[in-house]
Amino acid sequence: MSEHHSKRALSLDDLVNHDENDKSKLQKLADNESSVRSDDNRPGAIENIVNGNNSNSDLNSNGVIEEDTDTDDDVGGEFTFDNGITFDYDKQDRFSPEKKRIQARKKDTSKTTPSISNESPSNSKESSVPVDPLSSNISATDRKDSSEEKPDLTGPELVKEPDTNEYKRPSIQSITNAEDTTYNDHKAAGMEKTSNKHSLPNILSDSIDETVTEEHKPKTETEQTITEYQQENKQKDNVNESNSEETHDIKNDNMNQVEKIFQEKTSTLSKKNSVKKDLELLNEISASSKPNKYKNTPIWAQKWKPTVKALQNIDTNDFKIDNSILDIIPDDDLTKSVQDWVYATLYSIDPDLRPFIELEMKFGVLLESKSPDRVNPPVSSQAVYTDMDAHLTPNVDETVFKELSKYIQSLSEITENAGKFNVIEAQTKDAVYRVGTSTQRPRFLRMSSDVKTGRIGAFIEKRHISQLLIYSPKDSYDVKLSINLELPVPENDPPEKYQHQTPVSERTKERVSYIHNDSCTRFDITKVQNHNKGIKSNDVEITHEIELEINTPALIKAFDNIMTDSKEYATLIRTFLNNGTIVRRKLSSLSYEIFEGQKKIQ
């Protein structure tokens, strides 16, 4: 090694700074070389290189530690200085084929390989330096043929001149000044780093800077070893990086496959349930999004709710309802009117004559006084007709008469009513005589005799007291209530006295009477033949009369006890009117059925 250094030519720095002391310059170069050798021989540095610490990012763009070459042989051992103090290295290998291949490789690698930038030590593990094909090629050629001469690649980066379109190196002075600045910066940075992990970049950067300044200095064995380690580590890093990326991709694929395996496959039912949940959520949102005026119904639009539920304490299993809060049934207005009318009429009669009164109800059509038409007052329910000019002729339709007779007969023959009805049939002839003088009120005497035997059954004076007309717009027939007095004729005025006189009217009656003792009512169904003796002819008119007569002794008793117990009187009159209502409605229903039947027959 000493022989090699003794034969060494002067460096470019010596050539440029030739005015300095030659001895001091040589001493400085010797010190630098010794420091590089001592650092290379340390095991720590080699260890860092083997471990793949890629912190040597301060190398040149080609990633190759260039060798120093002698220029004495090329120029005949003499140095020529031009005015620009430049040294043209291109003249040595301008026409060399190896130079062209190297330049072509530089262009390819500059396109495909990103430039190496100085990174902090903390990021040195993550970053990887790409392998330079130029450096690997040069190292391979060195191993194949060590005796072959190599072109000078230690020069600085080529610069293209615009005039000649030729690549030339910059001046020696600019190169040396830039290299000295880089050397000092790297050395200062290396002094600040104390970690053993980052010691290799400092050592390498210092050694590289020294080799750059000593362009003509030949490579030592240690430097060649470092270069080989660097190239191997770069290749390993690239392989490891590609392997790690492949491994990471494989792991990601496996994770995706596992996630896909465990993904729940939604069924049709689950989809429907999710749709229902979404709809419920939308409904809740829409309901909650309504303004307050739509949430709370105003008072005027709310339905009425009773505060107390009706009949809430009634036991339906043992249901028993009272007639009213007073446990009585108040009479309707019509019944009350009849009760008052009867009471007033009876009160007006002499108490000695009250036992001879007769309260009867007859059915017929209420006619106007001046026309044969039925009255038509503006009412829709049963009412008392107060027009005294109207009159009612007791008469019903023959067919209805017969049907009603059958109906009442059937009622009397029902087993449940056995003993409640007394039936009396009679055929009598009534002759009415007018008795009195012109100065007295006329009297009408009625003589009743049996048609078959001719025996006189009764001889009475009949006085008309009062009547009440009741109009029933919903029924076929109206009602007339009348109170009469049937006074017996005194014994000094016997009936034989009037047998030779001409009666005012004669009537032959075929009567069937149904006496219902429980209701104190007598039902007289009578077919009447009226013998009208006129001047021109002797006509006979047949009518069908239905009469209801109240039990007079019961009525007088109830009337006398009205001051102590008014219920008996009110009940008696009400019962009598109820029996009349039943008959009236039955007559109306029979009339309707008969009328509809006649229409069908026609």
Swiss-Prot record:
Its EC number is 3.6.1.74. It is found in: Nucleus. The lineage of its organism: Eukaryota, Fungi, Dikarya, Ascomycota, Saccharomycotina. It comes from Candida glabrata (strain ATCC 2001 / BCRC 20586 / JCM 3761 / NBRC 0622 / NRRL Y-65 / CBS 138) (Yeast). The keyword Hydrolase applies. Coiled coil: none annotated. GO terms for cellular component: mRNA capping enzyme complex. CDD domains: CYTH-like_mRNA_RTPase (cd07470). This is mRNA-capping enzyme subunit beta. It catalyses: a 5'-end triphospho-ribonucleoside in mRNA + H2O = a 5'-end diphospho-ribonucleoside in mRNA + phosphate + H(+). GO terms for biological process: 7-methylguanosine mRNA capping; positive regulation of protein localization to nucleus; positive regulation of transcription elongation by RNA polymerase II. First step of mRNA capping. Converts the 5'-triphosphate end of a nascent mRNA chain into a diphosphate end. The active site is at K276. Heterodimer. The mRNA-capping enzyme is composed of two separate chains alpha and beta, respectively a mRNA guanylyltransferase and an mRNA 5'-triphosphate monophosphatase.
